[in-house]
Amino acid sequence: MSGTTGERPFSDIITSVRYWVIHSITIPALFIAGWLFVSTGLAYDAFGTPRPNEYFTPARQEVPIVKNRFEAKKQVEQFIGK
């Protein structure tokens, strides 16, 4: 026995003016917020990743690859200079 869930059909939602008024503002706002998050460098600070100019320092020009998983902590500390 099938019934109805009481929800509006999707076709009614996407053809309503209210849907497009709300989404014509929120979708571009999300893109702009994401662009600002990355372009200001806040994404690097929030996630702790190095900025593009910090991958290779003047003292270390090789790629920092961990070669022994059992001594990974020591190797990472050598890479960052601790």
Curated annotation (Swiss-Prot):
It is found in: Cellular thylakoid membrane. Disulfide bonds: none annotated. Its main location: membrane. Its cofactor is heme b. It holds the Pfam family Cytochrom_B559a. InterPro entries: PSII_cyt_b559_asu, PSII_cyt_b559_asu_sf, PSII_cyt_b559_CS, PSII_cyt_b559_N, PSII_cytb559_asu_lum. The chain crosses the membrane at residues 21-35. This b-type cytochrome is tightly associated with the reaction center of photosystem II (PSII). PSII is a light-driven water:plastoquinone oxidoreductase that uses light energy to abstract electrons from H(2)O, generating O(2) and a proton gradient subsequently used for ATP formation. It consists of a core antenna complex that captures photons, and an electron transfer chain that converts photonic excitation into a charge separation. This is Cytochrome b559 subunit alpha. It comes from Nostoc punctiforme (strain ATCC 29133 / PCC 73102). The gene is psbE.
